[in-house]
Amino acid sequence: MILAANDEGVLADVLIIAAALETQDVRDRPAEKQKQADAAHEQFKDSDSDFLVLLKIWDFFHQQKKGLSNNQLKKVMQQNFLSFTRMREWLEVFRQLRELCLQQKIKIGSRRNDYDRIHRSLLAGLLSGIAIRGEKHIYQGAGGMSFNLWPGSGLSDQNPKWILGSELVETSKRFIRNVARIQPAWIEPLGKHLVTRSHSDPHWHVKSEQVMAFEKVSLFGLVIVPRRAVAFRNIEPHTCRTLFIEEGLILEQMNRPFVFLENNREVISQAESLATKTRRRDLIVETATIFRFYDDRLPDHVIDGASLFKWLKESREN
């Protein structure tokens, strides 16, 4: 998370959030004053991210701190149902994280308040916290686990399709806390070492002169890319070669002309014409024969139009 934040240029923002996640929630919600506490905390809510709530509380504390005595600051915190003691713990963890960064010669920089960069950084450290909205606004998380959004979340009325959360809570139901709206496109680049891929429907693509297939990408059992077209050459080269010969060469489904295809077509046409005239079936050139002809003569690495063109060019030069 911290290394990702450094790469994204939002280390100053993420250090505050990371420190908060390592300490108890500074928000107080006493049983006898829940409504008052909820009303006081309303000023910090964010409809896209509970993590940004932490930054708002942090900023609130530092704004109130200016010009106030310790006792006055404690009173302001109490009036807003914020724990002064836990705030000091948060500050201490932040100081420790900041010191570790400085020891590693990592420049912290200034706050940027960039939503995408901040949440991509958080996602890098909380990949197992991703979830997708299912039926009846119940979210599906890693490993098939299901849960609801925490009622106090700023997103509880929004129910975004994809979220990131940092904490699961078990009460009468299972809830996820500290959640934020995320883009599914962020997940694969950050979790590329953990994703699983499956492929279906390999087919010859005339325009690109190669075999394409459809790829599905999943992380922790959640489908993050349902279906996208990908080149198949590095996945199953043997299948590519078979389809290349069958459809690209035998059926001549190529996007550019190749002289040898025209010549071979003429030879086959002449043989078929002669077979018709003489009624000699042994002169009919069968598809399997043509396949073997190409398979025997083309090097193994020739599996699409690009590799064929390159091999022909090198053969002519040599």
Put a short name on every predicted segment.
Residues 221, 240, 245-253:
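C-terminal effector modules of nucleic-acid-centric enzymes and ribosome-associated factors
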Residues 96, 249, 311:
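Catalytic machinery of carbohydrate-active enzymes
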Residues 220-233:
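Extended, non-catalytic structural segments that build the interaction scaffolds
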